[in-house]
């Protein structure tokens, strides 16, 4: 714990003992009025760090519950342990392939070491937020536009790892990073939409051509089979006549014998 690092070099002096005795004496002489000023209630999600005569007192934060703070010689800071969210302002930057984009992100973090967050950095929350902006810009600048559009999760994990490694010394733990939105220039959006439309049309033409090829091959196979079987050809001829006569129409069909048709074809 960081508290032990500070207390290891601290040796109480004579004046410290005198100040401590005076504080207790004042507390007892003004009792019970002093209770309203010296007794603090720490909530479940908070921790209180006490500094006595400017030095860290005890190596662990106090709370939750009732905490006694001595008058004149004790000062205290309350630290919230709940997860906090920070919406990173829109970052305008260039990708690796020189495309200007705007990125919106959110960072979720919490205080894991209240003492370190007070003793090692002036403002842990502000420092974490500024570091989040710079880390996001640095990571996105090394990725291409295609990577940004397809690998948001991987980028978020990389930014989280960089943030968590740096803020651990400050007593801050980064829970997660989310890439909320990636905005492209209007010209780029129109170009990508046109490219996607052209790709869809190309795919549709390929599918249509493949279908026609399959159908022609099926017809060719059926024709070959019918040509080798006169009975099957005759049956197909009769089926065609039935289909034509099944509907109310004005078509007049005059059937001819198949032998007559074959003779005409041979001629």
UniProtKB/Swiss-Prot annotation:
**Which chain regions cross the lipid bilayer?**
17-37
Organism's domain of life?
Eukaryota
Please state the span of the N-terminal signal peptide per the UniProt entry: none
Topology relative to the membrane: Single-pass membrane protein
Gene3D superfamilies, A to Z: 6.10.250.2090, Band 7 domain
UniProt-listed InterPro entries:
Band-7_stomatin-like, Band_7, Band_7/SPFH_dom_sf, Band_7/stomatin-like_CS, Stomatin_HflK_fam
UniProt keywords, alphabetically: Membrane, Transmembrane, Transmembrane helix
Which SMART domains does the entry mention?
PHB
The places in or outside the cell where this protein is found are:
Membrane
Note the Pfam families from the entry. Answer: Band_7
* GO CC aspect terms: plasma membrane
Task: Please report which protein family the annotation says this sequence is part of.
Answer: Belongs to the band 7/mec-2 family.
In terms of PANTHER family, this protein maps to: BAND 7 PROTEIN-RELATED, STOMATIN-3
Protein name per its UniProtKB record: Stomatin-3
Q: Which organism is it from?
A: Caenorhabditis elegans
């Amino acid at each position: 714990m960081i508290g032990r690092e500070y207390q290891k070099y601290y040796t109480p002096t004579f004046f410290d003992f005198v100040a401590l005795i005076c504080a207790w004496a004042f507390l007892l002489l003004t009792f019970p009025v002093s209770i309203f000023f010296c007794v603090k209630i720490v909530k479940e999600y908070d921790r209180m760090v006490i500094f006595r005569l400017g030095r860290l007192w005890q190596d662990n934060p106090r709370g939750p519950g009732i905490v006694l703070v001595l008058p004149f010689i004790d000062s205290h800071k309350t630290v919230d342990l709940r997860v906090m969210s920070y919406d990173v302002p829109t970052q305008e930057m260039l990708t690796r392939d020189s495309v200007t984009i705007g990125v919106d992100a959110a960072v979720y973090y919490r205080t894991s070491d209240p003492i370190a967050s007070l003793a090692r950095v002036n403002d842990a929350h502000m420092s974490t937020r500024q570091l989040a902006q710079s880390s996001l810009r640095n990571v996105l600048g090394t990725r291409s536009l295609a990577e940004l559009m397809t690998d948001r999760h991987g980028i978020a994990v990389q930014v989280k790892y960089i943030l968590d490694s740096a803020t651990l010394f400050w007593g801050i733990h980064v829970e997660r990073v989310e890439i909320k939105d990636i905005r492209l220039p209007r010209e780029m959006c129109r170009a990508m939409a046109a490219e996607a439309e052209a790709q869809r049309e190309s795919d549709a033409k390929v599918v249509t051509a493949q279908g026609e090829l399959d159908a022609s091959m099926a017809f060719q196979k059926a024709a070959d089979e019918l040509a080798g079987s006169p009975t099957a050809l005759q049956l197909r001829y009769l089926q065609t006549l039935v289909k034509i006569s099944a509907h109310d129409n004005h078509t007049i069909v005059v059937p001819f014998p198949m032998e007559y048709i074959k003779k005409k074809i041979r001629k």
